[in-house]
Design a protein with these regions (language model features):
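Conserved active-site alpha-helix within GNAT-family acetyltransferase domains
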Residues: 102-106, 112-130
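Conserved acetyl-CoA-binding loop-helix of GNAT-fold acetyltransferases
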Residues: 76-79, 84-100
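Short coil/turn motifs at secondary-structure junctions
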Residues: 60-62, 82, 115
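Active-site/acyl-donor-binding loops of N-acyltransferases
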Residues: 59, 122-142
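Short amphipathic alpha-helix that is part of the acyltransferase structural core
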Residues: 1-59, 66-73, 140-163
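Hydrophobic, well-ordered secondary-structure scaffolds
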Residues: 72-73, 92-98, 104, 110-115
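Short, solvent-exposed loop/edge-beta patches enriched in aromatic
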Residues: 46-51, 79-84, 101-105
Length: 163
């Protein structure tokens, strides 16, 4: 068994593991592996030429305390069913977080299905997402106060304050 970054010749194996573990649409999987997937930032547990587990460390830049910081967004945490319960993910997560530090990143981020799985590794909930669904016609009762215009470069400072 070996824990390491993937090679480009293993892209299909990583993709197969993703489609096995997640219910994403084919369009999404195609988009992800064409536009986001980076074998140099994807760690795997491999045994006998077979990929058993994977963690993708997608690179992002975030603004924190007025500073732009590079970070790894942990996604695609996955293990084949027959390899679960053997400690592979614990080893892979520990090695991945070591690599985050080796990249001079102070922290990693993720949006887990169940945050309890990641507390062991030092992750904590920093915010919740509130989703409200409403019918667009319910917005009729709100009156427009002001006007709209297409944003330009001159509006950048104002937009930064809003977002």
């Amino acid at each position: 068994m070996e824990i390491r970054f993937t090679n480009t010749n293993e892209n299909q194996g990583v993709r197969d593991l993703w489609t096995y573990c997640f219910t994403d649409s084919q369009d999404y999987v195609d988009f992800y592996f064409k536009n986001k997937y980076n074998p140099e930032k994807t760690m795997v547990v491999e045994d006998g030429g077979r990929i058993l587990s994977a963690i993708h460390l997608n690179q992002h830049r975030v603004k924190l305390g007025g500073k732009d910081l590079d970070t790894s967004y942990v996604v695609g945490v996955s293990t084949l069913a027959e390899a679960r319960g053997m400690g592979f993910m614990a080893d892979l997560m520990s090695r991945s977080l070591y690599q985050v530090g080796a990249m001079d990143q102070s922290f990693a981020i993720l949006m887990p299905i169940d945050h309890r799985l990641y507390r062991t590794y030092g992750f904590e909930t920093c915010y919740d997402i509130l989703e409200i669904k409403l019918d667009i016609f319910d917005l009729k009762k709100f009156k427009l106060d002001g006007s709209f215009k297409r944003a330009s470069k001159e509006d950048a400072d104002d937009l930064v304050e809003v977002y």
